[in-house]
Amino acid sequence: MRPPNMAFLSELRYPTRWYSKLIVALVAISFFTFVAAAIISGFVVYNIVTPRSGSQPIDLANFPGHPEEISYSLQASGTRDGWFFPGLKSAPTILLCPGYEEGREELLPLATALQEQGYNVTLVDFSGSKSSTGIGTDLGYREVQEIRAALSTLAQRTDVDQGRFGLWGTDLGSYAALSLAESDPRVRAVAVESVYDTPQQMLRILLNGYGIGSLPLLPSFAERGFDWLTYQDAAIPPLSQRLPRLAGVPKLFIEAADAPDLAKITARLFFQSPEPKQEEMLARGKYAGMLDDEKRSYENRIASFFLSSLPK
Protein backbone atom coordinates (compact mmCIF):
# COMPACT_ATOMS: atom_id res chain seq x y z
CA MET A 1 0.00 0.00 0.00
CA ARG A 2 1.29 3.46 -0.95
CA PRO A 3 1.97 6.02 1.77
CA PRO A 4 -0.76 8.71 1.92
CA ASN A 5 1.52 11.49 0.74
CA MET A 6 2.68 9.47 -2.27
CA ALA A 7 -0.90 8.70 -3.17
CA PHE A 8 -1.77 12.40 -2.95
CA LEU A 9 1.13 13.38 -5.22
CA SER A 10 0.21 10.66 -7.68
CA GLU A 11 -3.37 11.93 -7.71
CA LEU A 12 -2.16 15.45 -8.51
CA ARG A 13 0.05 14.16 -11.30
CA TYR A 14 -2.64 11.94 -12.80
CA PRO A 15 -5.89 13.39 -11.41
CA THR A 16 -8.90 11.12 -11.39
CA ARG A 17 -11.08 12.72 -8.70
CA TRP A 18 -12.96 16.00 -9.14
CA TYR A 19 -11.16 17.87 -6.36
CA SER A 20 -7.70 16.94 -7.64
CA LYS A 21 -8.69 18.04 -11.14
CA LEU A 22 -9.90 21.34 -9.67
CA ILE A 23 -6.62 21.88 -7.80
CA VAL A 24 -4.57 21.17 -10.93
CA ALA A 25 -6.74 23.53 -12.97
CA LEU A 26 -6.41 26.33 -10.41
CA VAL A 27 -2.63 25.91 -10.25
CA ALA A 28 -2.39 26.01 -14.05
CA ILE A 29 -4.62 29.08 -14.31
CA SER A 30 -2.64 30.87 -11.59
CA PHE A 31 0.65 30.05 -13.27
CA PHE A 32 -0.42 31.27 -16.69
CA THR A 33 -2.05 34.36 -15.15
CA PHE A 34 1.22 35.32 -13.48
CA VAL A 35 3.19 34.65 -16.66
CA ALA A 36 0.75 36.69 -18.76
CA ALA A 37 0.78 39.55 -16.22
CA ALA A 38 4.58 39.58 -16.22
CA ILE A 39 4.76 39.64 -20.02
CA ILE A 40 2.11 42.35 -20.44
CA SER A 41 3.49 44.58 -17.69
CA GLY A 42 7.02 44.15 -19.04
CA PHE A 43 5.87 45.14 -22.52
CA VAL A 44 4.10 48.24 -21.18
CA VAL A 45 7.10 49.33 -19.10
CA TYR A 46 9.36 48.84 -22.12
CA ASN A 47 7.09 51.10 -24.17
CA ILE A 48 7.06 53.72 -21.43
CA VAL A 49 10.84 53.90 -21.04
CA THR A 50 11.44 53.87 -24.81
CA PRO A 51 9.18 56.73 -25.99
CA ARG A 52 8.72 56.84 -29.72
CA SER A 53 8.81 60.58 -30.40
CA GLY A 54 12.12 62.34 -30.82
CA SER A 55 13.59 65.70 -31.60
CA GLN A 56 13.50 66.81 -35.21
CA PRO A 57 16.52 68.57 -36.76
CA ILE A 58 16.30 72.21 -37.79
CA ASP A 59 18.52 74.39 -39.97
CA LEU A 60 20.19 76.45 -37.26
CA ALA A 61 22.08 78.56 -39.79
CA ASN A 62 18.87 80.06 -41.17
CA PHE A 63 16.74 80.04 -38.02
CA PRO A 64 15.75 83.37 -36.43
CA GLY A 65 17.68 84.29 -33.30
CA HIS A 66 21.02 82.91 -34.55
CA PRO A 67 21.01 79.74 -32.43
CA GLU A 68 24.05 77.52 -32.20
CA GLU A 69 24.52 73.90 -31.26
CA ILE A 70 26.34 73.11 -28.03
CA SER A 71 27.57 69.76 -26.75
CA TYR A 72 27.92 68.52 -23.21
CA SER A 73 29.20 65.24 -21.82
CA LEU A 74 27.73 62.76 -19.35
CA GLN A 75 29.74 60.30 -17.36
CA ALA A 76 29.68 56.90 -19.09
CA SER A 77 26.82 58.03 -21.36
CA GLY A 78 28.51 59.89 -24.18
CA THR A 79 27.61 63.39 -25.31
CA ARG A 80 24.35 65.28 -25.77
CA ASP A 81 23.61 68.39 -27.75
CA GLY A 82 21.50 71.46 -27.10
CA TRP A 83 20.41 74.57 -28.97
CA PHE A 84 21.73 77.83 -27.54
CA PHE A 85 19.93 81.09 -28.37
CA PRO A 86 22.17 84.05 -27.46
CA GLY A 87 20.68 87.01 -25.61
CA LEU A 88 22.33 90.01 -24.03
CA LYS A 89 25.98 89.57 -23.14
CA SER A 90 26.41 88.44 -19.53
CA ALA A 91 22.65 87.93 -19.13
CA PRO A 92 21.31 84.86 -17.26
CA THR A 93 20.54 81.70 -19.19
CA ILE A 94 17.19 79.90 -19.09
CA LEU A 95 17.16 76.18 -19.83
CA LEU A 96 13.95 74.79 -21.32
CA CYS A 97 13.36 71.12 -20.49
CA PRO A 98 10.80 69.32 -22.70
CA GLY A 99 8.23 66.94 -21.32
CA TYR A 100 7.62 63.25 -21.82
CA GLU A 101 7.45 62.34 -25.54
CA GLU A 102 7.99 66.01 -26.38
CA GLY A 103 10.67 67.23 -28.79
CA ARG A 104 12.65 70.37 -28.12
CA GLU A 105 11.67 71.81 -31.51
CA GLU A 106 8.13 72.15 -30.14
CA LEU A 107 9.45 74.73 -27.66
CA LEU A 108 11.13 76.98 -30.24
CA PRO A 109 8.49 79.76 -30.04
CA LEU A 110 8.87 79.85 -26.24
CA ALA A 111 12.65 80.03 -26.61
CA THR A 112 12.32 82.92 -29.06
CA ALA A 113 9.93 84.78 -26.75
CA LEU A 114 12.40 84.57 -23.86
CA GLN A 115 15.33 85.48 -26.10
CA GLU A 116 13.49 88.62 -27.16
CA GLN A 117 13.47 89.65 -23.50
CA GLY A 118 17.28 89.57 -23.52
CA TYR A 119 17.83 86.16 -21.95
CA ASN A 120 20.18 83.50 -23.21
CA VAL A 121 18.05 80.40 -23.81
CA THR A 122 19.06 76.77 -24.17
CA LEU A 123 16.86 73.93 -25.38
CA VAL A 124 17.95 70.56 -24.04
CA ASP A 125 16.94 67.27 -25.60
CA PHE A 126 15.98 64.19 -23.61
CA SER A 127 14.85 62.06 -26.54
CA GLY A 128 17.93 61.58 -28.68
CA SER A 129 19.79 58.86 -26.83
CA LYS A 130 19.54 55.63 -24.90
CA SER A 131 21.47 54.47 -21.89
CA SER A 132 23.61 51.35 -21.73
CA THR A 133 20.49 49.47 -20.57
CA GLY A 134 18.71 50.38 -23.81
CA ILE A 135 16.10 52.63 -22.21
CA GLY A 136 15.39 56.13 -23.47
CA THR A 137 14.12 57.61 -20.21
CA ASP A 138 13.78 56.66 -16.57
CA LEU A 139 11.15 59.38 -16.07
CA GLY A 140 13.49 61.88 -14.49
CA TYR A 141 16.47 60.38 -12.71
CA ARG A 142 18.84 60.48 -15.66
CA GLU A 143 17.38 63.68 -17.06
CA VAL A 144 18.52 65.54 -13.93
CA GLN A 145 22.09 64.59 -14.76
CA GLU A 146 21.62 65.69 -18.36
CA ILE A 147 20.53 69.22 -17.51
CA ARG A 148 23.19 69.41 -14.80
CA ALA A 149 25.80 68.66 -17.46
CA ALA A 150 24.25 71.22 -19.82
CA LEU A 151 24.23 73.89 -17.11
CA SER A 152 27.85 73.18 -16.17
CA THR A 153 28.90 73.49 -19.81
CA LEU A 154 27.04 76.79 -20.18
CA ALA A 155 28.64 78.09 -16.98
CA GLN A 156 32.01 77.92 -18.72
CA ARG A 157 30.99 80.38 -21.43
CA THR A 158 32.25 83.94 -21.20
CA ASP A 159 29.18 85.51 -22.85
CA VAL A 160 26.65 84.50 -20.16
CA ASP A 161 26.20 85.11 -16.45
CA GLN A 162 28.07 82.08 -15.12
CA GLY A 163 26.35 82.07 -11.75
CA ARG A 164 22.67 82.70 -12.55
CA PHE A 165 20.39 80.30 -14.40
CA GLY A 166 16.66 79.77 -14.74
CA LEU A 167 14.88 76.49 -15.43
CA TRP A 168 11.52 75.72 -17.03
CA GLY A 169 10.00 72.32 -17.67
CA THR A 170 6.81 70.33 -18.01
CA ASP A 171 6.09 66.89 -16.44
CA LEU A 172 9.33 64.94 -17.11
CA GLY A 173 11.23 68.18 -17.69
CA SER A 174 9.70 69.82 -14.63
CA TYR A 175 10.76 66.94 -12.37
CA ALA A 176 14.32 67.21 -13.68
CA ALA A 177 14.30 71.01 -13.38
CA LEU A 178 12.98 71.12 -9.82
CA SER A 179 15.29 68.32 -8.73
CA LEU A 180 18.33 70.15 -10.09
CA ALA A 181 17.19 73.44 -8.55
CA GLU A 182 17.11 71.75 -5.15
CA SER A 183 20.79 70.81 -5.43
CA ASP A 184 22.48 73.53 -7.51
CA PRO A 185 22.80 77.09 -6.11
CA ARG A 186 23.39 78.46 -9.61
CA VAL A 187 19.67 77.98 -10.29
CA ARG A 188 18.07 81.26 -9.22
CA ALA A 189 14.51 80.77 -10.53
CA VAL A 190 12.46 77.76 -11.64
CA ALA A 191 9.08 77.41 -13.37
CA VAL A 192 7.47 73.96 -13.46
CA GLU A 193 4.27 72.75 -15.08
CA SER A 194 2.56 69.48 -14.11
CA VAL A 195 5.43 68.35 -11.90
CA TYR A 196 5.43 65.07 -9.97
CA ASP A 197 7.09 64.11 -6.70
CA THR A 198 8.71 60.84 -7.80
CA PRO A 199 9.17 59.07 -11.15
CA GLN A 200 7.02 56.24 -9.77
CA GLN A 201 4.06 58.66 -9.68
CA MET A 202 4.53 59.44 -13.36
CA LEU A 203 4.77 55.73 -14.08
CA ARG A 204 1.38 55.12 -12.44
CA ILE A 205 -0.18 57.94 -14.45
CA LEU A 206 1.22 56.50 -17.68
CA LEU A 207 -0.01 53.02 -16.70
CA ASN A 208 -3.50 54.48 -16.34
CA GLY A 209 -3.11 55.88 -19.84
CA TYR A 210 -2.44 52.36 -21.09
CA GLY A 211 -5.63 51.21 -19.37
CA ILE A 212 -4.00 48.78 -16.93
CA GLY A 213 -3.82 50.98 -13.85
CA SER A 214 -6.89 49.41 -12.25
CA LEU A 215 -6.28 45.80 -13.31
CA PRO A 216 -5.08 43.18 -10.82
CA LEU A 217 -1.37 42.27 -10.76
CA LEU A 218 -0.34 44.36 -13.78
CA PRO A 219 0.37 47.69 -11.98
CA SER A 220 2.39 46.02 -9.21
CA PHE A 221 4.34 43.95 -11.74
CA ALA A 222 5.02 47.07 -13.82
CA GLU A 223 6.18 49.04 -10.78
CA ARG A 224 8.51 46.23 -9.73
CA GLY A 225 9.96 46.12 -13.24
CA PHE A 226 10.50 49.88 -13.27
CA ASP A 227 12.11 49.76 -9.82
CA TRP A 228 14.45 47.06 -11.09
CA LEU A 229 15.45 49.23 -14.07
CA THR A 230 16.13 52.20 -11.79
CA TYR A 231 17.57 50.33 -8.80
CA GLN A 232 20.69 52.54 -8.77
CA ASP A 233 18.50 55.59 -8.03
CA ALA A 234 16.40 53.96 -5.31
CA ALA A 235 17.95 56.10 -2.58
CA ILE A 236 16.98 59.42 -4.19
CA PRO A 237 14.32 61.05 -1.97
CA PRO A 238 11.09 62.58 -3.33
CA LEU A 239 11.16 66.22 -4.38
CA SER A 240 8.88 67.13 -1.46
CA GLN A 241 11.55 66.10 1.05
CA ARG A 242 14.07 68.45 -0.55
CA LEU A 243 11.83 71.49 -1.02
CA PRO A 244 13.20 73.34 2.06
CA ARG A 245 16.45 73.78 0.11
CA LEU A 246 14.58 76.13 -2.24
CA ALA A 247 13.88 78.76 0.40
CA GLY A 248 14.66 82.10 -1.19
CA VAL A 249 14.56 80.75 -4.77
CA PRO A 250 11.57 82.11 -6.77
CA LYS A 251 9.30 79.30 -7.95
CA LEU A 252 6.31 79.17 -10.30
CA PHE A 253 4.03 76.12 -10.11
CA ILE A 254 1.66 75.70 -13.07
CA GLU A 255 -1.33 73.36 -12.81
CA ALA A 256 -3.20 72.22 -15.92
CA ALA A 257 -6.85 71.18 -15.67
CA ASP A 258 -6.47 68.73 -18.56
CA ALA A 259 -3.90 66.78 -16.52
CA PRO A 260 -5.82 66.43 -13.22
CA ASP A 261 -3.57 63.82 -11.60
CA LEU A 262 -0.45 65.90 -12.16
CA ALA A 263 -2.34 69.07 -11.19
CA LYS A 264 -3.08 67.60 -7.75
CA ILE A 265 0.56 66.69 -7.20
CA THR A 266 1.70 70.12 -8.42
CA ALA A 267 -0.72 71.86 -6.06
CA ARG A 268 0.53 69.76 -3.15
CA LEU A 269 4.16 70.60 -3.94
CA PHE A 270 3.24 74.28 -4.20
CA PHE A 271 1.62 74.13 -0.76
CA GLN A 272 4.69 72.42 0.74
CA SER A 273 7.18 74.71 -0.98
CA PRO A 274 8.82 77.60 0.92
CA GLU A 275 8.54 81.21 -0.20
CA PRO A 276 8.90 82.91 -2.59
CA LYS A 277 6.45 81.02 -4.77
CA GLN A 278 3.66 81.62 -7.26
CA GLU A 279 0.83 79.44 -8.52
CA GLU A 280 -0.85 79.49 -11.92
CA MET A 281 -3.85 77.45 -13.07
CA LEU A 282 -4.49 76.74 -16.75
CA ALA A 283 -7.35 75.11 -18.59
CA ARG A 284 -4.89 73.48 -20.99
CA GLY A 285 -1.29 72.48 -20.38
CA LYS A 286 1.54 71.21 -22.58
CA TYR A 287 2.77 74.24 -24.50
CA ALA A 288 3.17 72.33 -27.78
CA GLY A 289 -0.54 71.47 -27.90
CA MET A 290 -1.87 74.94 -27.11
CA LEU A 291 -3.72 77.19 -29.52
CA ASP A 292 -1.88 80.28 -30.78
CA ASP A 293 -3.61 82.67 -28.36
CA GLU A 294 -2.95 80.29 -25.47
CA LYS A 295 0.71 80.06 -26.45
CA ARG A 296 1.12 83.83 -26.48
CA SER A 297 -0.52 84.13 -23.08
CA TYR A 298 1.69 81.34 -21.75
CA GLU A 299 4.84 82.95 -23.17
CA ASN A 300 3.93 86.26 -21.53
CA ARG A 301 3.35 84.56 -18.17
CA ILE A 302 6.68 82.72 -18.26
CA ALA A 303 8.54 85.82 -19.42
CA SER A 304 6.89 87.90 -16.69
CA PHE A 305 7.95 85.40 -14.03
CA PHE A 306 11.58 85.36 -15.11
CA LEU A 307 11.75 89.14 -15.60
CA SER A 308 10.69 89.62 -11.99
CA SER A 309 12.65 86.69 -10.54
CA LEU A 310 15.79 86.61 -12.68
CA PRO A 311 16.57 90.20 -13.69
CA LYS A 312 19.08 90.73 -16.49
Question: Which role fits each region the language model picked out?
Answer:
Residues 159-171:
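Alpha/beta-hydrolase fold nucleophile elbow
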Residues 137-158:
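Alpha/beta-hydrolase active-site loop
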Residues 180-232, 244, 249-250, 264:
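Hydrolase active-site cap/lid region
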Residues 111-133:
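Conserved alpha/beta-hydrolase
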Residues 72-74, 83, 229-311:
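Serine-hydrolase catalytic core
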Residues 169-179:
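Glycine-rich nucleophile elbow surrounding the catalytic serine of serine-hydrolase chemistry
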Residues 91-99:
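Short beta-strand element of the alpha/beta-hydrolase
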Residues 4-5, 9, 18-73, 80-83:
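An N-terminal hydrophobic leader/cap segment in hydrolases
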